[in-house]
Amino acid sequence: VFLKIMLAQKERRKLKFFRLFEELPNGEYTVKKISELLSYSYTSTQKILNEMEAEFQDFFQEDFSLLTELGTVQLVPTNLNYDTYYNYLIHRSIPYRAIICSLTEPDKDLLSFCKENFLSRASAMRQLQALADYVQEFDLLFNRSQLTFKGDERLIRITLFNFIWAASRGTEKSLNVLAKQPIDEALLFLQHEIPLLQDYVGRREIHLFAEIMYQRIRQGYYVVDDTRYEEAKFSENQRVKTTLVEHLAIPPEHLDAEFHFIQFMMFYAPTFQFPEDVRIAQMPSFSGHGQVLMPLLYKLDNYWAAEILPGDTSFPDNKVVHGNLFNVLFCYYIFPKRIPTLFLLMSYFRRKQTTCYKYLKGKYSVFLKKMSRRKDLQWLTTCYEDLADLFAWLTLDIFEEHQFREKLQVALVMESNYLFSQEIKGFLKDLSFIELIPFSPEHLPKTDFLITSSAMLIPEENHLPYVVFNFFDGETNYEKLYANLKRNYRKKCYANMAHNTDESQTS
């Protein structure tokens, strides 16, 4: 999602070209060969290579030429890597420059922006359309003609933070108005409430958010307060409020709302990493009279033991997972329609939806939909699917760890010669999910997988999966063996999971 918003199709193709350059063996390649490897036409390949050649001059000046005098392509030197080129394209992109412009030059309209970036108004409008469409999902409006955002100020700041952080990781030079030291001083007294301040990357995140906050306040945009923040019992530290007024120029009438929103941002993402996090000890206090989120989590504990992992009562002991579940719930409690998160901009998770993930998401959907019928939880109606998705990812590891305790039973069907078996036994010993057992045709029902030196050694009645390691022709592909073992291990675990689920439903 992030790349499709930030980069035009041609720029995304350039990244594919660069990735190919990193994978190819050293040497020179014809334009035709590159076009064939990427399945692009010769003409479009030539055009993209010419543009990349011009861009690389920003890195190499006259020291390197992508296209040789003979018209061949030589690979990029190793001192320019994919990540550097990726960041280069992102920072040059029109959507990213428009976002930065909206913060640092609020008086600049689209025509001035186009003149500065040497592009037509029509081209700019077209390149900014994906950004406008994306923010509209959260009831925000991005006015492309004025380069301004309208809507809930809290969601605007979160959206700006997401894009700028994903693009710059806090290194955007134009957002360095505030000296870092005053920000640290202003937030020093919130060290317990904001553990991110004790983390190297966390401090960068906070500094970036403070810069965005400062720029928006400077333009006259303020957040509104929200009584629902009481679910997390925010601090009212007057000393911190005073330093915020001094360093961020917050008018007194907006101070409480801005201070509360700063604290909300500590719950904006699943930021719990360690059981020692001081906020974990505070969580039981969130279940007082009138509060709904912690009681909902307690109900989830019971549901886990009854429906998700029948009989497992250890789920409440995982404080880090519970802290992150609370954070996610809290975000959607405040913004039930949908909240823009970095998670939604990532494509990584969309490609790794395992059977366990789908099982968990289905279970959470049933639970949250049922809970949404209660009067104090009707806000779940609009967001239970999003929550089920996040809950599934947050609990996937502990669920799989529990499911995958049983090992894959592997037997060797090969000559009784230690020279044959010692290497493969050593390989299997390093795999934590494998248990090597003696082979016997009578024990086939207790065996999951066979490794043999010849298919001729496999018993006729065998129905188990197997791999042949023929030592005489050198067919000993350990990578292929590992992938095969892992695939069968997961298949066994999923079968056990389905069996246990059926048993719990019939009992």
Where are these regions (language model features)?
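A cross-family "folded-core" feature that marks the main globular domain of proteins
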Residues: 2-507
